[in-house]
Amino acid sequence: LEIICLTHGENIITNQKGFDNFVIYTAIVMITTIALSINLNSGRFDFSLGAMAALSAVTGAKISYAVLGGGQGSAALMLAVTIVAGAVLGLVSGLIYVTLRIPPIITSLGVTLIYEGILYTITSGKYVMTEVQNSSMSGFAGTWVYAAIIIAVVLVVSIILFDYTGFGYDYNALKNGQKVAVNTGIREIPNAL
């Protein structure tokens, strides 16, 4: 992208901070795309991904700030709480889909509205980072190195999970033909959850 811009006499990355931001935001988009593509490949488009990410991040920020007041360890606690909250919210979304047997598009729209309503209630419609921002909460993402490490870890985990595990085998079978996969004994419901 920088090369294309340079051919037109423009720069995107003009200093180290610009490079840091480029890698960090590339990591965010890449990881979100990987998460979204998991459902897309199997025919279940999920609109609730953004609301799920926002609600789990706000939950992590609020809890870590309430417990540690933004002090030492707040970023690590926020990360742990955010991951757990994201997993729980994803499980709830999957349970709604499996239990109610509503088409995935309707389920994801409903879950999006519910999660955004909860998010609005928790934050009172205000930007949460003005409340919790301090050096311990934002210092983690200050350099491209952490983003590059996260990209590498996500790629390795994704490759191992989807290419070398029983879950990946079932996922790929369901992705390539749900009816045939189910008829051969692969259980769709645990895979969807």
Placement of each model-derived feature along the sequence:
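Transmembrane helix-bundle core of multi-pass membrane transporters
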Residues: 100, 104-165, 190-193
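Residue-level recognition of pore/gate-forming positions within transmembrane alpha-helices
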Residues: 29, 54-58, 86, 112-113, ...
